[in-house]
Amino acid sequence: MFVRRLAALVGATALGLVAALGLVAAQAAPLRTAPTPDVRAYLVPVAREPGLTAAQRLALVRRHIKYVFVLYQENRSFDSYFGTYPGADGIYSRPGVATPGFVQPILNTDGTLGTIGPFRIGPAQFAADTDDVDHSHDILFRKMDIEAGHALMDHFALAEERKYSPHGKPSLKAKQFGELAMAYEDCDTVPILWRYADRFALYDHIFQEIVGPSTPGNLSIIAAQTGVTQWMLHPAAAWWDANHDLGEPVANDADPLWGSPRDPTAHKIAVNAHDFAGAHPYPIQLNQTYASLPLTLAGRSLPGVVTQDTRAATDLADVRQDVAAIGHGGHAAVDWRWFEEGFDHEPTDSVDPTDATGQHASYITHHNGPQYFGYIANNPVMRAKLRGLADFFAALKGGTLPAAGGVFYVKGGYDNIFGLKPADPAAAVQRRFLGDDDHPGYSDAEISEAMVARAVNAIAASRYWKQAAIIITWDDSEGDYDHVPPPALQYGPNGDRISDGPRVPLLLISPYARVHAVVHAVGNHASVVKFVDALFALPPLASLPDELEGRKIGRLRFHQANLGPEDALTPDVTDLLSGFDAARLSGRAAPLPPSYAETPARLVDRLPAVTGYGCKALGIVPVDAQLGIHTTPPADFNPRPKTEPSPGGHRG
């Protein structure tokens, strides 16, 4: 009843806020979406673009692409990073009254009702270093505010605020966290990412597959699910409280069983020892037993590979039919790696005094998707595919990646191996925001995009560039505001929607990518799996017999058609192929040179907040600026209410 009363009051003030921002009149002006001059020379005229069927496009992509690099970052909604990118479906793409969640309720510290809309933060607020807003399943579900099956996207501020002050007047900290959920950044904070969007293909309708935090995203990027098949095959494994229960489908950040104190094996896989120290150790998840890309990538060698599993009876029980089907499929094995900072020795081990445990101290165990699967962790052949971040750069420099190609996931961690420091001189920031995987609360956004740029530069400088597809995307939306209601694909054991969640950015970089393109195709994390399936002619995970059995149970018992991997048989999941340029694929235009993808070292080695590199230098005018909309943070805004509690924090 309280929430409904708030909604009514917000509706009464919405038009006033929209008018104050000047949206109704300003949006009549046409937006400037043309590429910058250095990009314009690489545009292919429409007249030179051949018409290709889907089959022809796929055949050409298969001819040209052998290496897939997935630079997998953490915790950013599309609107929080690209909501004002010209040409994208963003915050100001339509009048505020037609934009879901544009005006939201927030409680003032005196208990009165206020309203809040999205607002820009930048270098003046040290926007590269923000605290972590809540993105657990329960609170993200509340933020989406689903009524009658439709996500209203209008409780991002209130649900965040109520986490810290569930009843009565909110504390200042609670209100500041609610405000933080509505902040967005642009090319003055992450100019390198905007540079990639300007030069290559930006997808603006990719959703996080699961409503929840990081672990689900790191499972779905290799499995196109987080355990709905396991839930169907083992109903007793289901959770009822997604935030606190172990179980299927995975919707929280419990650590993998393998490597944990409960791991029964003699040769334990890597783990960050901090996870199980102190009074509040990480919970430990169930062994994951459904199919993932590492199985289908093994091809006809899979029946032999799985004989190396030291706990085959339990690890393989739910994929026996899958293994046989993949083995009989006849395709050759495709190699893969998961490179994650801290998994093995890194150059920075033991350097930072906060990393007292040395090796694995920068490792974020619950971000390593493959480690959750016993058939990977307990199989020395599979387990050998898991490496550290420095190993990735060494492999590129040494040219030691497999000659036949493969799929290579790349992730940062709690630290950064290049010794970069945040631009904000505050002691707490210098101590706590050294990470490079873009996760608020410990990563610096500028350090994180520098890591991505180093990875792209290294690929561009390597022998692999001419056959590469680089996908940059994020594992979840952080709990930050995004205005686009996600498709409704799956519902969990307690009836909550679990798929899809809010949008995340996705960028495609390749010699054959479209230039200065915004791709509106709808998809989610399973789109990456679907692309890999298509490129290497793998059987979709959704087509495997054990997964089909789970889907059948879902239809009969739960009356849901999509309880299985989402890389096939599920609507609204693109294969990403529309981001490739038909003219370049067919030879009517030259492939993009490596220099076009490279970011100059002067922009990578020094952070934008130091050099001043941003929108003006890029030559990009964000949509809000084009429309004459100049938002300011609330008077009591604090980008770090937890790290630096204060009445105001950094304001600008």
Each language-model region and where it sits:
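Bacterial N-terminal signal peptides
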Residues: 10-22
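N-terminal pro-sequences and low-complexity stem/linker regions of secreted or lumenal proteins
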Residues: 28-652
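Bacterial N-terminal signal peptides that target proteins for export
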Residues: 1-13
